[in-house]
Each structure stands twice: as structure tokens, then as C-alpha cells.
Amino acid sequence: MTAGVCMEKLDQICKKFEETYQVKAMAVSIHHHDRCVYTYHAGAKADTLFSVGSISKIMTTVAVLKLVEQGKVELDAPVTRYLKELHIPDERAGKLCVSMLLDHSCGLAGNCYQGKYGNAVNRRHLQQCIAYANQVRLKDTPGMCSTYCNDGFSLAEALIEAVSGQTYAQFITEEILRPCEMKHTDFPLHSLQEGKFLHADSGFDFDYPQEYVNGIGSGGIYSTAEDICRFFDHLMQGNLLHPATLALMNTKHAADHCGISAYSDARYGFGWDDVENPLFCQYGLTACEKSGGTFGFSSHSILLLKEQFSCAVTLCTQKGSPTLLNEELALAYLSETMPLVKRPVSNSLPKPCDMRKWEGVYAYNKGLLRLRKEMDHYVLELDENGTWVRAEKLHTDRSGALVSESGSLLRHHDAQLRLTAADAHVYMVLVTPHPLDSALKRRFVYAEQLIPGEAKKTKWQQLDGHLYLQDDEWLFQRKFAHQPLLIRPHHLEGYGGYLCLTHPLWEQNEREAVNTLRFPGTNAAEIGNLLWINEKELQYGMYHYRCADALPLLEEGEYRFRDAKVHWYRITASFEQLTCYGNARMILLDEKGNVLFDSIYMNGIHDVETACYAGIIMDEKAMVKVQLHG
């Protein structure tokens, strides 16, 4: 195939994706042997900056490894050797080594979000992450299991600053951006020039303003597809790391002491999401991949060291997978420019455990599932605040897996559920055909079975039936419309000792409920501990929650606060007029926590006569004026 025909094929793939998902903006870059061989842009120019999210972790990883090469850091050394202010109140914390920050096995909760995703810079976020780590127990033993963790890379960012004596941005600029001539990469430390970056769609009336991901080392860098490939070129050529160090970075490091990782697609290297993707392995190719996503942006990058090949996609859209687009583009280019021979690869699937162990309640970080037997089939149900809903009828196929009669299982087409045992636990493993090659099976450890137990009378039961609102988020935080602001603690019959939010926690004692899930990937990620303050107040992770029953009523008048934190009110009357002055913000929630109105992103209150809760946030010299209907 000629080069022109190959480029035409790549154009067709990009245009189809753009039209199918109504993409606001996208950029693609492909490099081969240190040369840009293909680009595609829609809704953006070559130098338009995208928020590339967790691709920032690759730069953080390279920065740590450069310090290792300089003899300033040891990968097997305890993190506290370099972060003197880190004092995690957990007897297991001494096992936390530098390398564990890079392969997601650090055991941290991973949910330090306060002030992280904002419309303004928060220069204290790193200090807040360390302060949070110093308040709570670890989620798991360091080195036990590689469960995706943003907080590990925030600590790596702090380590870079502590060891180098420079800010993270200064070190990355001097050690990576300048040597790689990455002229279109920046940090969320200042206002970017209008027209040089993209505004993501908010889902309300107005687009989001500039995004500030204040956890820069875990996901805050702005860049372009071209700059990402340029970075990878220099990495592959040995301009940033010695070959042996790069080989170490590109090696699978995912911890597997929980015994289930063999059936997980979480094949982490240092920084990388995947270093052994079967989609490429079947052609004898070793691809290292990293994706990224923030509110309104998503991205994906691929590096093939032996072939000196890199490919990057940056998107501004709420739809479509940058991973699948990038993988399709990479294979389309490689298949036309070099001889590829497809060979079968090991596609091992988990062996079903004893069927008598299948029934029960399973949990992951965003929900609870119940599997029960009925006559000649199984039923899978979802927990919704203590009520089992959305029953799905399943039956076993010839391989011993559960499949849905509807053809769709847990919103995945042609999926299987395999129930397998490891380390005395039973897990749900979701198996789906790869969208680009149906002969390949993708595997995700989806949920872990809870252990039944008799109910114990504890003060935690006093929380049942009550609603709690998160009341200490920051004025310019972007996540109000994206993360749950409400929690409804409840207990499950027959499962004493577990306190359920959207996911279960184990009632460690009368003051603390802790994580109970341990398996690799993302479905056991971002789970904090719950601390009892009193019956009306809780702390989950780093956030304070207040019982809705204890909230004051919203009344007419002027509201003035100076702390830039959200204050919640119950609403019993509809609005006649609402006015925000200065750096003030008002948010209305319905009883399920859905955002009905946000004064930053909406022109006026739409179709809302009476909401359930109002949040008022402001700093100095600001005011919110409320006038209610009689």
C-alpha cells in the first residue's frame, strides 16, 4: 500500500470517530523512527492545548527515575526517607517504598480530591494530600495489590520537589520539556491565553472555564498529541533515561499477592496502564500504553520501543474511547508499513469455582451486586440505598460462565461473568470481546464477594435511613456536578459488620469503618475510610459530611461567608430571585444529589420550583441574595 493510501485509511478512521461521537475537538499524532508521519486535527489546531490527565503520570515517572539515575533516590527505599513530613498512622506504612508509588501498589486510598479539580489554581493541594495521608489508615498493605491510585503520584510529585529542591513544574521543564523541545506543554499554575487551550463542555448553559487539575503530577499537565509523541521519541532514543532504566519502566510490576491479578487487564509498569496488551502481543509487538481523563477531556498514548513508534490521541468530548481510537490507528499504520504476522496468544480465562459458592453479595467501588439462584437460572441485582433493583436474568453457558439472556451484561455487549476463587475469596471477573478483535477477550476483576455474618448491634446502625451532605468543598471546585455529594449509609441483612455507602466498609471499631475490597485495576480504587464524629457528622476520606436532618432552612435574605467552603441548607419554598455578587456560587441539588442549578455554569434556574438542598459558597467581599416565593 502506498503512503497516500495509508494516510487516507487513517483519515477515514478519524473522521468516522469524529462524526460518530460528535467530538468537539480532537488531535492525533503518529511518529515513526523520530519522524512525524501522520496528524489529524478537528476543532483544534496543532498547537491547541488539551488537558491530558493521567498521561502526566508518565512525566512524573520519568522524573523520579531521573533522580534514581542521579543517585538521589532509591526505588526500594521507604518514601519517608525523602518525605520527612509523611507520618501515616498505620503500622504497615513502613513498607511503603518509592517504587510502589509508580506501580499503584502503595495502598493509599487514592481519593484526595478536595480542591483538586478546579476552575482556579490551588497551590496547597500537595500539602493537603500529605495532611490527608497523615490522618487516615492505609487502604491496603503496600506492595500487596496494584489498585489504581492517583494519590501515589501526588506523593511522587512531592518527592520530586523535596529531593530536587525545585518545584515540580521547574524540574519537569528543565529535565524533560526543554530537552525534548516540547513547546506546547504547560502546567495549571497560571491563566492560559484564550485560543491556546480548549474549554470543555459543562453540560449546563456555559462551557467550563480553564481547567486546573491541581494534582499536577497525577493528572494536571496540558499538552498536545504532537508533544506527547515528541516526548516518547526522546524517551526511546535514550535522551531522557538510560536503556536499562527505560526497560525497567516498561516491565510489568503489578503486585499480585491477592492471587487474582492473573485474570486482570491491569498490567501496570512504572507509570504505564498496560505493558503487555494482547492486541499487540499477537503480532509480536510490545506496546506500553497510558490513558488520561479529566472533566470533558480524554487522551491515550502508545509507545513501541523496538519499532521506535508512538501514537497519541487527545479529545475534548464526553463520548467515545480514545484508547480504542488510538489502538485502531496504531494497528492500521503498522500493518501497512511493516510485515505483521498474527499468532495466537495466551487468552487464559478464570476457572469457575464451585457453583455452591456463587450466590451472595458482591461489591466494587461504585456499587453492590447480589447474585441469587432461581430455579434453572440466576438473577443479578443492583443495590440502590438498601433496595435491590434492576434484576437481570442470567444462565450458564458451556464454559461455566454466566451470560445474560438480553445479550448485554453490566452494560457490556456479549459479556460473560466468571466466578472464581483466589486467596479464599470469590471474585466476579467480567470477560468481554475486544471491540477491535472479537477473538481476544478483555478481563476485568469487577467485584469481590462479601462474607455473610450475623448482625451486631453497634452505633453505626444509627446512621441507617439518614442522608449526609459533603459540606467542606472549595469554592472553585469543578467536581460538584460529577462526584457524589451525598452518602446514605445503610446495612445489609445477613451481612453484619459491613456498613454500606455506594460500596461496603468494614466496621473496624466504633470510630472507624475501613476498606474491605482488595483486587487489582480500577474497580477497587478510590475508597476512603469513614470516621464517626457524632450521629450528625461524619468524615469520609478527607471530606466532612453533615446529616441533612440537621441542616438549617434556607430563608430570604443576604448570605455572606468568608471561608470559600460550601454551606448547605434545606429548601421548602421555591425561588423568586437569586443573585450572586463577587466570588460567590450557589448550587441546588435534588434529593438524589443531582445538580439542578450551578450559578457558575448556568444563566438562571431552569424548571426548578422547589429543590431539596442549596449550597452557598463564597469568599471575602462576596454575597448571595435570596428571595423566595411566599
Language-model segments: residues:
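Acidic-leg catalytic submotif of subtilisin-like serine proteases
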Residues: 180
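ABC transporter nucleotide-binding domains
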Residues: 205-206
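Short, surface-exposed recognition loops and adjoining beta-strand edges that mediate ligand/DNA contacts
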Residues: 184-195, 260
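Active-site-proximal loop and beta-strand segments within enzyme catalytic domains
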Residues: 2-5, 15, 19-26, 32-33, ...
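Short glycine/serine- and small hydrophobic-enriched flexible loop segments
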Residues: 65-70, 157-162, 230-237, 315
